[in-house]
Each structure stands twice: as C-alpha cells, then as structure tokens.
Swiss-Prot record:
Annotated pathway: Cell wall biogenesis; peptidoglycan biosynthesis
Function: Cell wall formation.
InterPro entries: Mur-like_cat_sf, Mur_ligase_C, Mur_ligase_C_dom_sf, Mur_ligase_cen, Mur_ligase_N, MurCDEF_pg_biosynth, UDP-N-AcMur_Ala_ligase_MurC
Binding residue positions for ATP: 119-125
GO cellular component: a single term: cytoplasm
Encoding gene (name): murC
The protein's name: UDP-N-acetylmuramate--L-alanine ligase
Source species: Cytophaga hutchinsonii (strain ATCC 33406 / DSM 1761 / CIP 103989 / NBRC 15051 / NCIMB 9469 / D465)
Length: 466
C-alpha cells in the first residue's frame, strides 16, 4: 500500500464504527474523504458535518468525480458489504487500489508502537480505557476505537508521533480474522468465547486464530491475557503475564467493592498491592476490562498514579452500560450486548447496582447464525431478567435460516414473563409494564428506539435527575 499519490479516500460502509474512525483519520490528515452507507445515521450525519460526502444509494452515478480518479483514490471496504454491491464490484473490476478496513488499519499502525486489544467481549471499553490513560498521561497516543467515547465524543484519537514517539491503541477484531493484519508490541486478550461461527468453520478454528494473532506480535513484545485464556505464547515474546481473580493469576484482582454505581478494587502482584483502583461503571466484566487497560498502560510506561487517576475519570463508551435516563424511581440503561456472555454480564451488573429492583429487558438478537449457534446460551442469559420483550432477529448481512426465529428462542427461556414484540408494537407493550430498570440490548438497529423509550420514561416520571 502506497499513499504517496493518494488525494482522496472513498469508504464503502463509511457509517460503520470502525470505518468511520478511518474516515476521520484520513480527513484530519487532509485527505478528501467520502463514502457510501446503506442508511443515514447519527454517525453518518456527523461525518457529513465534518465535511465528508456521504450518499445512501448503491450507484456509481452517486459517487463524486474526485473518487473515480483511479490514480489518486484509495477505496476501503468493510467485509460486511455484500458480494453483489455495485460500487464495490466497479472498483474491483476496474483495478482501483482497493483494501479491507483491517488492511488499512494494519498499514497505518505498522511503523508505530501498538497496543492491540483482542477478545470476544470488552474490546471497545478496554481500548477506550487504555487510550484515555495514555492520553491523560501526556504520552503521544492515537486510537482507533469501536465506539464513541464519552470523554472525547469520538471514536478516534490522533497523537503527534514525530520520530515514532508514543503509542497507537487499536481494537484487534477477530471478525473475518481482521486482527491478523496487526503487529502489536503489547497484545492483550481479555477473553476467548466462540463467536462468528458463520466465518470460522468450527470452534477450534476460532481458537486457532488467536494463536495466529499472537504470532504477529513484534519481536520482544508483551502478551497480557486473562488467566483462563488458553493460548500459545510465541517464543519471540519477551514477557507473558496473566490477570484475574484466580490465585494463579500473575496480577490478581482483590477487594472488589461496589459503591455509588461504580467499583473499587485492588491488584496484587508478588509482594506489591495497588489499592483503591476505581472505575465509575459497574460489573466484574468492567473490572476485568480496567485491569487489562491498567496493565497495558503500565507496560507502556505510564505511572501507576496516572493510571489510577485516569481510570477514575474515564466516562465510559456510548452503548456500553450507558445511562439514558436515571432518577430515584426509574433507570434506563442501553448496551451493545449481543452475545450470551455479554448479556449475562450486563444483567449481573444491573443486579449488582440495583439489587431487588424489577428489571425489564428489551433484546434484539443479532444475526440468524449467531442466534442458531448460541440458542441455549441466549435462553439461559435472558432468564436473568424479570421480564423480557424479545424483538425479531436483526439479519444484518444474512438471509433467514429455517427454524431460527425469536419465537423459537422465546420458548426455550425458562420464564413466564416474556413476549415477542415487533418494532411497531414495542413501545405499546413496554408502556403496559411496571418496572424499576429498563434495559435495551443488541447490535442491530435497536438504538433507534433509545429516544422514544427515554421519552416514555420522562412521561412516566419527569425529567431525569440522577
């Protein structure tokens, strides 16, 4: 890949969270940037407001002329784009410089010291925490994130990397084996629960990909993994450490105390204890995320005091246990959880902060294949809520699979307080229920209901005051 003669960058799927981060990087580095997406969203509107040309019809007639000049345009696409996409096929068949998002991310980060955050769950929160710590420490830091951070209201940070100074924090995404394009100096693996079995032929192939990711570690690099993550440490790693609650962990999480909606804990290592580590978000999964970010920043050279202060000031990520509405009578939490393990962690975190409260969950399953592959696990996780409104499966890139429906999933859930709802009936059904906490969860288009549900909460109890 050579950017010497590139003046314009065109992104097919520009509204995706990872793609939009690349779009913003190129725009802030003075490239002409534009792209296509299937539907308008808050994110695409933000990109347009930042000066990028975005359209929503798959047609070369819609592509501005500047992005059709073969010698000066770079075309980037996401693997979520269907194979019959007209624009993608035009650029491919006519020999344009065409790359996947992951290839471009690998290219942009290869000459810089990189922290790669991998794992089925928690990548975005951990990456955002690590980036915030590095940024607050004064160390030059760039970050390509899979969510909008509350601290910076963006999914990208751009640092001054003159003479290769500082660090890049990048999400190492296992989907489509994208993380094999990265060569991290510090490789973090938070967890390794099987997912994306529509991409991987079987569970073992999924696990094997993480070993392949670690082989990409730069010579002398460091591996940080949760203690129960079973991987092969490459011989060229200079150090491999584990973290977790277990006595076997090199860095052991201790003294976990839930208070005021957040968590305080300590980390023990050999004869050293780091006390009073505080995050302003609930859940043991976030304690794990924070510990991974803590260790990544520690090995990158940030002081312990600076790490602790930054974790305390970390404001979270949009759609990751995000409080949409909160007062003394009613709380509304929105979350991106779309895997059974994530749903379980979300519901346990809600129980941790709001013990004894009645919880209603609105869940939109994401992908027919994921619903099929984890049907029993979804049923077990969703049984943790008091009442369930289950939406129809969001197909994303997939066609329906016979016998895989929300009704089939509903029948497996060991609960009587449950119902399948359409998008049209969701608000009406929710309005009928009494609850103390309402949760929306999913990775599809459930986020379009956030504001209507917030309005319902306000109509019931007035403006939020917490």
């Amino acid at each position: 890949m050579n950017l010497t003669h590139i003046h314009s960058v065109y992104l097919i799927g520009i509204g995706g969270i990872g793609m939009s981060a690349l779009a913003r990087w190129f725009k802030q580095n003075n490239y002409n940037v534009g792209g296509y997406d299937k539907t308008s969203s808050d994110l695409t509107k933000a990109l347009e407001a930042e000066g990028m040309a975005v359209h929503y019809t798959d047609s070369m007639a819609e592509v501005p002329e500047a992005f059709t000049k073969k010698d000066s345009v770079l075309v980037i696409y996401t693997p979520a784009i269907p194979a019959d996409h007209l624009e993608l096929n035009f650029f491919r068949e006519n020999g344009y410089a065409l790359y996947k998002r992951s290839q471009v991310l690998g290219f942009l980060t290869k000459e810089l010291k990189t922290i790669g955050i991998a794992g089925t769950h928690g990548k975005t929160t951990t990456s955002s925490m690590a980036a915030h710590i590095m940024h607050e420490s004064g160390m030059p830091c760039s970050a390509f994130l899979g969510g909008i951070t509350q601290n910076y209201n963006t999914n990208i940070l751009i640092g001054n990397h003159g003479d290769g100074a500082g660090w890049v924090v990048a999400e190492a995404d296992e989907y489509d084996r994208s993380f094999l394009q990265l060569s991290p100096d510090i490789a973090v693996i938070n967890n390794m629960d099987p997912d994306h079995l529509d991409i991987y032929s079987d569970v073992q192939s999924f696990y094997d990909s993480f070993n392949e990711y670690l082989k990409k570690l730069k010579p002398g690099g460091i591996v940080i993994r949760r203690v129960d993550v079973d991987v092969q440490i490459p011989s060229h790693a200079s150090l491999s450490v584990t973290f977790g609650e277990s006595v076997e962990a090199d860095y052991r999480i201790q003294n976990v105390v839930v208070e005021d909606g957040g968590v305080t804990f300590s980390i023990d290592h050999d004869f050293t204890r780091w006390n009073n580590i505080r995050i302003e978000m609930p859940g043991m999964h976030n304690v794990m995320n924070a510990t991974a970010a803590f260790l990544a920043a520690h090995f990158a050279g940030v002081s312990i005091d600076s790490i602790k202060a930054s974790l305390r000031s970390f404001g979270g990520v949009k759609r990751r246990f995000e409080y949409i509405y909160k007062n003394t009578k009613l709380v509304y939490v929105d979350d991106y959880a779309h895997h059974p393990t994530e749903l379980e962690a979300l519901l346990k975190a809600v129980r941790m902060v709001f013990p004894g409260k009645k919880v209603v969950t609105v869940f939109q399953p994401h992908l027919f294949s994921r619903t099929r592959d984890f049907m029993q696990e979804f049923a077990q996780s969703l049984a943790l809520t008091d009442e369930l409104l289950l939406m129809e499966i969001y197909p994303a890139r997939e066609l329906p699979i016979e016998g895989i429906t929300s009704d089939v999933l509903l029948n497996l859930i060991p609960s009587t307080n449950k119902k399948v709802v359409s998008k049209e009936s969701l608000l009406t059904e929710l309005e009928k229920l009494n609850f103390d906490v309402v949760i929306t969860a999913g990775a599809g288009d459930i986020d379009r209901f956030i504001q209507p549900i917030k309005l319902l909460c306000e109509q019931r109890y007035g403006k939020a005051n917490g």
